[in-house]
Structure formats: C-alpha cells, structure tokens
Amino acid sequence: MEKLTKKGLDGTQLKTIALVLMVLDHIHYFFEFTGCIPTVFSMLGRLSAPLFLFCTVEGFAHTHDRRRYFIRIWAIGAAMAALEFFMIYAKAFRRGDGFYPQNAIFQDLVLLCIVWQGIDWLREKKFAKGIGAIAAVLCWPYVVVVFLLLFPGVQEMPIASTIVAFVITSPLPMWTTITDGGWSFLLGGVLLYALRGHRRVQLTAWAVLIFLCDFALPFGMACRQAGFVWTQMFTDYYEWFGVAAVLLMLLYNGQRGSGHKRL
C-alpha cells in the first residue's frame, strides 16, 4: 500500500478502474431482472461516474486542444441522447418488457466543459466571456420555457414539438432534464474544477457535497416513510457509495499515463 501511495495512480489507471466498475454497474443495470446479478455490482459501480468526472476535469485542464476535446464529448453525448430519444418517443430498441437505458452522463460533461471554460475565462479576467458561458448553461432551460410560452401552438404541432424535444434532448441539452448524473454530479464537477490546484480542499469539498446530496438528503426524506430502517441506506439507497471514489482520487499522481488514449 505504501508503494502504491508513493507512486500513485496515473490518469490511464484511474480510467481503467472506472471502466471496470462501469461494466459491473451496467451488467447489473441491464440484467438485474434475471435475479442472477448481485447488487454489489451496482454498489461498486457507484464509484465509476465520480472517477470518470475527475479524469475529465484533469483531461480538460491539460488538453492542448479544448475545442477538439469538447467536440468529441459533445458528439458522443449527442449520439447517446439521440438513441435515448428514439427509445422514449418512438419506443424503438426497447427490451421486451419496455425497459430502456437512461445513460446520459456525457450530456452532463458537455455542460460542465462549457462551465469550466467559463471559470477559466473569469480567472483570466475575461468577464464577459466567462459570465456568458456560465449563463448560457444556466439560462438555456428558461429560454426554452419562454419560447414555449410565446409560441404555445408549437406543443400542439406533432412535428414541431418533436423537433423541440429532440433538440433539448440531444444536441442542446438542458441541465434540468438530463436523466443521468443529476444536479449533485454537476455541482461536484464545478467544485472539482474550481478548486483544482488545492487537492485536499478540492476533494474534501467534493466528498462533503456528495455525502450531503446523496446520503443526508435521501436519509432525511426516507426517514418520513413508514417502515424505513437506517440499514436501508446500505441496501437500497446506496448512491452515496460513490463518495468512496475520493480515496482513489487522492492517489492520483498528476500523470496522464500511457495507453487507452481514447478513454
């Protein structure tokens, strides 16, 4: 353990760990209905998204071509969201029992990349560009709402309403409607980037946020339910297990690593 701590884990190793955990999580997600997949697969999978988020923060900060980096994430996110759109509205590619996956984590990363760039512009005292980038992400859902209020007839037109739904699902996602990650993931991403360079403060703040959002808040709500027992936080409401990813983040040695360039 001392040797591992001294050397640390590079970016490639962290991504590989995250990928393995993601595979376990997806096996449970897709095949839980068989009753043959242990819940521990999903529990371990809670660490995957935080690790990928951390690696994306580092990747965005160090890449030599942010535009290309962003476009690649956007393209993957848009493609995955487009597939999800057809599953929802056209009921295509669904499982026999009607199940369809809701995997849109790349849409979260698309929005975060814009906010991260805005943060850097603010640091460079390019206030107009920085505020504009962040405001674009925050205000986009409200722009859509205003548009629909001004043109209510759009919602009654099948083709027009479908186009609007597709646009806000795939190419121009809204933070209020993304089905994967959620607002705690987005806030965590902002914290991780804003506090880069102060590793202990960065990871402590992130861990506290995730614990509050994914443990304290659900616990407070679940306590009001009849028959709830605290042990259910370890068997049913285990989204907060993702906070354990901070232990692996602490081992990051700042190196990109070799191989798996497309991860």
PLM region spans:
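Alpha-helical transmembrane segments and their immediate juxtamembrane cytosolic regions
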Residues: 1-263
